[in-house]
């Protein structure tokens, strides 16, 4: 194998510099500020004076019933969003992989939602399911379903889960299609000759060979549901009704101006995501076969 080197030793660093700057500015700096603020407590409304309070913010957060309820809601939302987004994406990718004519058109059509901003995606679903004027809300009422996510917490949770999953389906679809195309067609044809039907071929041949892709998307969707869905939730329900979909970090930090509590919650969430990702790589990856 031929080794490729840059003619100028400084050039690689220049090429990496923009990404390094973005990572430092939009990840490491905010994370360090959140960790710092989690040990501080503001003494005035303008934040001009703060006091070091050690672990008081973490103790208060972990003993707050509202926070514990928020953790439960977050876990339910995360699991449902990841499963729905990956399940629908796999179904669409399998269908698109069988299409002979117009593959490019269908794939382009299915990846468009990923380009929609989270807040815009939330507003679209809010309009469609608005109890007063939404098209789908009208159809639900015509079929005897008392639809009102502004009053029913379960309906509100279902709506934000569907909206968040819809936004992520396109991303998952791209990777599942790539994974399906990488599977040798000779294996599928051999199984068909042996008499294996479509469902059996999928579960015994296709799905196991998609394990690396599925594992990668499981990690990505977990992080997405934790960190990248605020815009959707805030646009669709605003945290209601009755705190059924409340974004407690936002409310404490930007509404109640309690930066210490908000930062402590952010640090705990970051630790949970890191631990969950490490667990996935440590235990789930053992069941993934890459060859």
Swiss-Prot record:
The keyword Calcium does not apply. The complex is composed of two ATP-binding proteins (UgpC), two transmembrane proteins (UgpA and UgpE) and a solute-binding protein (UgpB). It is found in: Cell inner membrane. It is a multi-pass membrane protein. One of its GO terms (cellular component) is plasma membrane. It comes from Brucella melitensis biotype 1 (strain ATCC 23456 / CCUG 17765 / NCTC 10094 / 16M). Gene3D superfamilies: MetI-like. The chain crosses the membrane at residues 10-30, 73-93, 109-129, 156-178, 205-225, 259-279. Part of the ABC transporter complex UgpBAEC involved in sn-glycerol-3-phosphate (G3P) import. Probably responsible for the translocation of the substrate across the membrane. This is sn-glycerol-3-phosphate transport system permease protein UgpA. GO terms for biological process: transmembrane transport. Keywords: Cell inner membrane, Cell membrane, Membrane, Transmembrane, Transmembrane helix, Transport. Pfam families: BPD_transp_1. Residues 67-280 form the ABC transmembrane type-1 domain. InterPro entries: MetI-like, MetI-like_sf, UgpAE/MalFG_permease. Belongs to the binding-protein-dependent transport system permease family. CDD domains: TM_PBP2.
């Amino acid at each position: 194998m031929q080794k490729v080197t840059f003619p100028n030793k400084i050039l690689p660093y220049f090429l990496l510099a923009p990404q390094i700057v973005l990572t430092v500015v939009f990840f490491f700096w905010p994370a360090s500020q959140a960790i710092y603020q989690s040990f501080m407590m503001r003494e005035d409304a303008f934040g001009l004076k703060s006091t070091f309070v050690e672990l008081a913010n973490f103790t208060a957060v972990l003993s707050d019933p509202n926070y514990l309820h928020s953790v439960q809601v977050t876990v339910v939302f995360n699991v449902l969003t990841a499963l729905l987004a990956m399940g629908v994406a796999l179904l669409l990718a399998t269908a698109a992989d069988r299409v002979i004519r117009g593959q490019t058109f269908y794939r382009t059509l299915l990846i468009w939602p990923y380009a929609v901003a989270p807040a815009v995606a939330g507003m679209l679903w809010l309009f469609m399911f608005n109890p007063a004027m939404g098209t789908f809300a009208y159809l639900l009422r015509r079929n005897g379903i008392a639809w009102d996510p502004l009053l029913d917490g379960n309906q509100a949770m279902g709506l934000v889960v569907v909206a968040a999953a819809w936004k992520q389906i396109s991303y998952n679809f791209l990777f599942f299609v790539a994974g399906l195309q990488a599977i040798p067609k000779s294996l599928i044809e051999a199984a068909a000759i042996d008499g294996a039907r479509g469902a059996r071929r999928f579960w015994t041949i296709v799905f196991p060979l998609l394990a690396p892709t599925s594992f990668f998307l499981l990690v990505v969707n977990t992080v997405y549901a934790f960190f990248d869905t605020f815009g959707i939730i805030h646009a669709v329900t605003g945290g209601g009704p009755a705190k059924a979909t409340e974004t407690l970090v936002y409310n404490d930090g930007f509404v109640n101006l309690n930066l210490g509590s908000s930062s402590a919650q952010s640090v705990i969430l970051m630790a949970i995501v890191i631990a969950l990702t490490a667990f996935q790589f440590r235990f789930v990856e053992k069941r993934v076969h890459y060859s």
